[in-house]
Every structure is written in C-alpha cells, then in structure tokens.
Amino acid sequence: MGVPLESLAVGKCYLTEIGQIRRVLEIKEAMVKYESRGKTAHGGSWGALTTVSNLRFARDVEREVPCDYDPRSRRYPEPNR
C-alpha cells in the first residue's frame, strides 16, 4: 500500500500491515532511521534502530498514526477506505 514519500517526517509514527508501529528518528540522504514496536517488534516498548531507504519505508507502511497508537485498541478507529 504505502504513504506518499513527501509525508514522511521526523517524529511521526506509521503503522505497517502487520500492526508494527514505526517512529521516524532521522531522515538523511534518502535514508530513514526508525525504531519500532508492536505486534512483532519488541511488544509495547520501542526497540532496536533500523535504517532503510525512504522509498522502502514509505512503501512498507500503511498510514500515519499517533505514536501512542495500539492496533489492538478501539480508541483509534480505522480510516474509511
């Protein structure tokens, strides 16, 4: 699915298809450094740092979410598709 490349920003969080939350820490020279948490990455705690191309990051996430987002919670409804 993916998000527009121009929507990526430091400090924002994004949700992947499998329920992982990724928080952008740095964008430099077309590379995105992020930390992740959620379904498959470190439970509820922010985990190890990962760096990928901005194109791959934008492709691999579904949408922007609040950084305290919990995919198991009904607190944040799914967007209309």
Q: Where on the chain are the PLM-derived regions?
A:
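Tryptophan-anchored aromatic micro-motifs
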Residues: A9-T16
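Short, charged beta-turn/beta-strand-edge "cap" motif at the junction between a beta-strand
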Residues: G19-R22
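Mixed-charge, Lys/Arg-rich low-complexity intrinsically disordered regions
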Residues: M1-A9
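Basic/aromatic-rich interaction segments and small domains that mediate binding to polyanionic partners
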Residues: L25-G47
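Intrinsically disordered, low-complexity, charged/polar segments
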Residues: T40-R81
